[in-house]
Amino acid sequence: MADATEKAEHDRIFKKFDANGDGKISAAELGDALKNLGSVTHEDIKRMMAEIDTDGDGYISYQEFIDFASANRGLMKDVAKIF
C-alpha cells in the first residue's frame, strides 16, 4: 500500500497525463505525455495501453493507473522526476 507521499505523487502524475481532466487517460493523452520522455512510437503506446488498460475499455482509469504504479514503483520514481 502506498503511503500519503506516494499517493500524492501518483495523483499528481495521473492528473498530468489526464490532460482534459475527465478522470481517465486516453491513448492520445498517454502519447502526448510520453513525448516528454523521448521518442515513443504508436506501437509503444498501443503496447502500454494493452498492459495498463486491464478492462479493455480504451482508457486508463485512475485505479488501473494506481495498480500499474504499485507494481512498477521504480518506473514511477523515474516518471515522477520528469513530471
Swiss-Prot record:
Q: Does the keyword Repeat apply?
A: yes
Task: Give the UniProt keywords, A-Z.
Answer: Calcium, Metal-binding, Repeat
Q: List the molecular function annotations (GO) for this entry.
A: calcium ion binding
Domain EF-hand, first and last residues per copy: 5-40, 43-75
Q: Where does Ca(2+) 1 bind?
A: 18, 20, 22, 24, 29
Do you know which Pfam families this protein is assigned to? EF-hand_7 (PF13499)
Leader sequence range is: none
Assigned GO CC terms: cytoplasm
Q: Which InterPro entries match?
A: EF-hand-dom_pair, EF_Hand_1_Ca_BS, EF_hand_dom, EF_hand_pair_protein_CML-like
Binding-site list for Ca(2+) 2:
53, 55, 57, 59, 64
Q: What does this protein do?
A: Potential calcium sensor.
Protein name (database record): Probable calcium-binding protein CML28
Q: Which organism is it from?
A: Arabidopsis thaliana (Mouse-ear cress)
The beginning of the lineage is: Eukaryota, Viridiplantae, Streptophyta, Embryophyta, Tracheophyta
The gene name reads: CML28
